[in-house]
Design a protein with these regions (language model features):
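Nucleotide-activated sugar donor-binding and catalytic core shared by glycosyltransferases
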Residues: 1-431
Length: 431
């Protein structure tokens, strides 16, 4: 075959780009036929706004199509600029709303495969479904859908490749004898603005009792330095009574981390300094003895590396929490939206037993989750207790690794894509 096959991938949040798209694109190196990769980014209330920029940095991706062009193509059939379909291809859903992937497949007349957490709507539009764990398959009740669903493992595990070992990181960070605390304030703008200030204030409280504690912030590639500065002076900082400033590397920064690239440093009024790092999250996770994080991809990645974590979700201002689907549209209604969200968010939260992936997978609490009207003092108290219990941290780390499973899911997904492509275009394709 001389003409490359189109691989159309839908993905639309920071966690999906880093935890799903990147390992799948890497695994496509073994794909049986020549191909071009087109990433469509549908609309998403959780988008950071930087998805297109980050995806464009992935060398194997031929073209990125943003939300507006995606919707135009689906609704009107208007081709995105520079996008010329090959006539043969496959649509792969990795995140967002299945509706967009289903309509893209229909518009292009390509078969489709979906990797989901149990969702199987638009089932007739998909040749196959792939899921990470058996309990996700059990959520479905349609025998026909179950028959075309495969459990392949968690693709996020294939993304985790620390640049340094824990021992090397301890040496580079200069804390061979002291514990390390990693802050992961998220990548979505609304979350980051609120949680960075919350976690920095929490560190102030912890350092007052554990002055030798080493700390670091992993700044998502989806977050800019401008957003970092804004988060330290915005309403989140005012809410928690935080007085802190950000200093880019080389501008009065006191931290050194060997060959690690330090983005800058956060300095608080009380004298606490926290180094910030970009693009080195797995090395930092491997370094940490404990991580403070919000729910999401991070919880799987930390668990895979055996790093204990403390999840916190302050719902002190539920009107600021982004919501999916109809609830998200309702929340955006002028004047009434925020009042409705103040009522909706606590109700949604009450229905969720666990938010951290390791706890969801285990069906019980392995790592603590602090949710609701919470404050930095409370999180600091729990974190100090965990940090002082070295044997407890070690046991939690071992349990976390067992729960999330083994890597290799990305390659198993590629095998499914090959099966679907082979059965659809068997006359025109040879291995």
């Amino acid at each position: 075959m001389t003409k490359p096959l189109d691989i159309i991938i839908t993905v639309n949040s920071p966690g999906e780009v880093s935890g799903l798209l990147k390992p799948v694109v890497a695994a496509l190196a073994t794909f049986a036929w020549p191909y071009r990769i087109f990433v469509f980014i549908p609309p998403c209330p959780f988008a950071s706004g930087a998805e297109s920029r980050v995806v464009e940095e992935i060398p194997q991706v031929n073209q990125v199509i943003g939300a507006q062009e995606t919707v135009r193509f689906i609704l009107r059939g208007r081709l995105p600029a520079k996008f010329t379909p090959a006539g043969k291809g496959i649509v792969l859903f990795l995140g967002g709303d299945l509706t967009y992937a289903a309509f893209l497949a229909k518009r292009l007349r390509y078969p489709a495969v979906a990797y989901t957490e149990g969702l199987t709507n638009w089932a007739r539009s998909f040749a196959r479904f792939a899921m990470a764990y058996p309990w996700m398959v059990d959520k479905g009740k349609n025998p026909a859908v179950k028959k075309k669903t495969a459990v392949i493992g968690n693709i996020m595990l294939d993304a985790i490749k620390p640049e340094y070992s824990k021992e090397e990181m301890k040496r580079l960070m200069g804390n061979e004898q002291a514990p390390g605390l990693l802050l992961l304030p998220g990548s979505r703008p609304a979350h980051f603005q609120y949680m960075l200030a919350f976690y920095v204030k929490t560190v102030e409280k912890i350092k007052a009792q554990m002055p030798t504690l080493a700390t670091a912030v992993s700044i998502s590639p989806f977050v800019t330095e401008e957003q970092l500065r804004a988060a330290l002076s915005g309403w989140g900082a005012k809410e928690w009574g935080l007085s802190a400033t950000y200093h880019p590397a080389g501008e009065h920064t006191s931290t050194t981390a060997g060959s690690l690239k330090v983005l800058g440093e956060i300095k608080t009024e009380t004298g606490v300094g926290i180094p910030c790092f970009h693009h080195q999250q797995y090395a930092l996770m491997n370094w940490a003895d404990l991580a403070l994080t919000i729910p999401g991809t991070n919880t799987v990645e930390l668990a895979a590396l055996g790093v204990p974590l403390l999840v916190s979700i302050p719902l002190n201002h539920p009107e600021e929490i982004p919501l999916e689907g109809l609830a998200g549209l309702v929340g955006g209604i002028p004047l009434l939206g925020k009042a409705l969200k103040r009522r909706l968010v606590p109700k949604f939260q009450a229905k969720i037993k666990f938010t951290a992936w390791p706890n969801r997978l285990a069906g019980e609490q392995i790592v603590p989750e602090l949710i609701g009207q919470i404050f930095p003092d409370e999180v600091a108290e729990v974190a100090i207790k965990m940090l002082r219990d070295e044997s407890g941290l070690a046991k939690a780390g071992q349990r976390l690794q067992k729960v999330v499973g083994e890597p290799g899911a990305a390659q198993r997904l590629i095998d499914i894509l090959e099966e679907v492509v082979g059965s659809t275009y068997h006359e025109g394709f040879t291995r």
